[in-house]
From Swiss-Prot:
One of its GO terms (biological process) is negative regulation of DNA-templated transcription. Changing D296A: 33.5-fold decrease in kcat. It is an enzyme of class 3 (hydrolase). Binds 1 Mg(2+) ion per subunit. Can also use Mn(2+). This is Cyclic di-GMP phosphodiesterase RocR. One of its GO terms (molecular function) is cyclic-guanylate-specific phosphodiesterase activity. Mg(2+) binds at E175, N233, E265, D295. Changing D318A: 8.4-fold decrease in kcat. Its EC number is 3.1.4.52. Changing D56N: 5.2-fold decrease in kcat.
Amino acid sequence: MNDLNVLVLEDEPFQRLVAVTALKKVVPGSILEAADGKEAVAILESCGHVDIAICDLQMSGMDGLAFLRHASLSGKVHSVILSSEVDPILRQATISMIECLGLNFLGDLGKPFSLERITALLTRYNARRQDLPRQIEVAELPSVADVVRGLDNGEFEAYYQPKVALDGGGLIGAEVLARWNHPHLGVLPPSHFLYVMETYNLVDKLFWQLFSQGLATRRKLAQLGQPINLAFNVHPSQLGSRALAENISALLTEFHLPPSSVMFEITETGLISAPASSLENLVRLRIMGCGLAMDDFGAGYSSLDRLCEFPFSQIKLDRTFVQKMKTQPRSCAVISSVVALAQALGISLVVEGVESDEQRVRLIELGCSIAQGYLFARPMPEQHFLDYCSGS
């Protein structure tokens, strides 16, 4: 572990002494200390940066919350460990605030301080620093000419991520996702090209390429005895096209596939200011027999409004609720409520982002039946997906 600057923010002198003494035994580098937020701000200004701030929340003078806000604005603090005993609901709200401020939350230290707990949190910090993916700078994104060339050369490929039954892993369907087989950079996810496509109105061209590839795969699945439903992501900009439903119908006819074999996923945020033509397209698709899914349900601010106004046949619950089940008790209440909502509306529910068996078991207890996530399968190219579906 490299040398670290660790700041202990604690107003109770004995607790601060215990923490500093323990940290000096296990942390290579400098251990700084402050009795309140004002002292901590002064330390930040003098030392340049702090790798980890161990922060008590309830202090006289400038408290921990005010210090965290200042730390975010200064850009001089990387990670935060809480050392306050607070109500679980307040704790979760504080964690959310820390993350919204752009700070990395490592965990709770609790009181009294434990050397074993400090060591575990330092190990977590080191692991996150090593594994943290580097943010893609705009300058590193491919040029529009490169993206257009890739589209013209057929370098964008449909990948498939299964939707499965939680209680047995049986295949229910799959989502079709985009990957770019770049000739020099290898397989690239959407984070490398979607921004350019959205900026230069290339999303529609990508959609039709993926849709054609997906329908060809769906026909092969039928031949394998696996006539499952495939879901395609529709960008909000496409919904205003009067020809969208008509062109989808034409391709389904060309591939001799029923409309019920496909579903279209639309994010809630993409429907906030949807024009009448968008609603017309969605109604036409549902009349044809296609499925419609509200993607990332719960991630925005108007999920229930959208669910009432648009003819959805499926809800895809945003992955954040699954990720927070263990640390935020209210997430479980939200999930069980969405289960009841889907049942009352007579539509299906897919839970996204399932990554552990512990999550799978808890979701079953909450009434969920269909899920998608790395626990079951990562997105895969066509041949791997066909092998997956045939059990080979």
